[in-house]
A protein has these predicted regions:
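Short, surface-exposed basic-aromatic patches at helix termini and helix-loop junctions that form
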Residues: 78, 102-104, 132-137
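Beta-hairpin (beta-strand-turn-beta-strand) motif
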Residues: 89, 101-103, 148
């Protein structure tokens, strides 16, 4: 299955789970109690993964988790009305997945900006060090990977 096709399938399953619960309910609950976001993240991830794995055993689990995590972050940022920019191509080798609040702010005030990078395959870890050139504050570079980075050789 092509990566784009798998990505669309993953997003479709996520938004199916969102509709089951109710987008407005999720938004209202998170607005009134930010701690509920953790419960919704767990619930949406589990519902989506269960449906994806049960319908297609050939999916690459690493890529499924990475793509699902990224789609879920986009959803959570949107319902929380937090400003962000997505899929910013810096050059032919480096694409930033998410910048909060935006690239302009990252360039002028990196201490007030966060980069979120989703690693869907091990070789993508090689690009992490390149992010440090645009975001000098290491604690403001968040890496999302399906397993602990200490496990990666």
């Amino acid at each position: 299955m092509k990566h784009e096709l798998a990505g669309e399938k993953i997003k479709k399953e996520l938004y199916y789970a969102v509709r089951e619960i109710g987008k407005e309910k999720i938004q209202k609950d998170i607005s009134s109690c930010i701690q509920s976001s953790r419960e919704y993240i767990d619930l949406l991830m589990n519902k989506s993964i269960d449906r994806l794995i049960s319908t297609d055993q050939s999916l690459d689990y690493d890529r499924v988790i990475g793509t699902l995590s990224e789609a879920l972050l986009h959803f959570m940022l949107t319902i929380s009305t937090l400003p962000s920019e997505r899929k910013i191509r810096l050059n032919s080798e480096l694409v930033i997945d998410v910048v909060i609040p935006n690239l302009r702010n990252l360039k002028t005030n990196p201490s007030k900006s966060i980069i979120v990078q989703f690693i869907k395959q091990g070789p993508e870890l090689n690009n992490v060090s390149k992010l440090e050139f645009i975001q000098p504050n290491h604690e403001n570079i968040w890496i999302v990977f399906y397993r602990p980075l200490s496990d990666v050789k």
